[in-house]
Amino acid sequence: MNLQDNTLSRVEFLDYFERFSDLGDFASKGTQLAIDLSTAQVFRTKLTTTCTGLNVTNTPDNGNANAVGFSLFFVGDGTARTMTWNIGSTAASWAGGVAPTYTSTLNKIDVFSFLSRDGGSTWLGFVGGQNF
């Protein structure tokens, strides 16, 4: 194994994990949801107020234009909320150009994933599932 070139070749994983961070209720976090990719890759929050976007920080970039991603579990609080799908100052791109609507039903979970192939300058959004 030689990690001086930042490459692992022909690796077989027996187990695979991603770090999880429970962000708690969103109302206490301000208007943008803070996503710190140095702490986790999977996040959970309960939207208890309107969210004007995601503030993604510490996007890993080793200069090799590697892809990076994260997932969000949104838990409904029983009240319809507005979600603006901006990441930083740029709107996430969704299939068909249509952003999803957040499920507000009490304790129902929506899962969304985001992928960037340019170090976090632009993001593609994916619906992993809704109304779980």
Label every PLM stretch briefly.
Residues 1-38:
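Intrinsic low-complexity, repeat-rich intrinsically disordered segments enriched
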Residues 29, 40, 98-100:
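Residue-level detector of functional hotspots within protein domains
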Residues 46-132:
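Acidic, glycine/polar-enriched metal-coordinating patches/loops
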Residues 39-45:
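Short carbohydrate-recognition loop motifs
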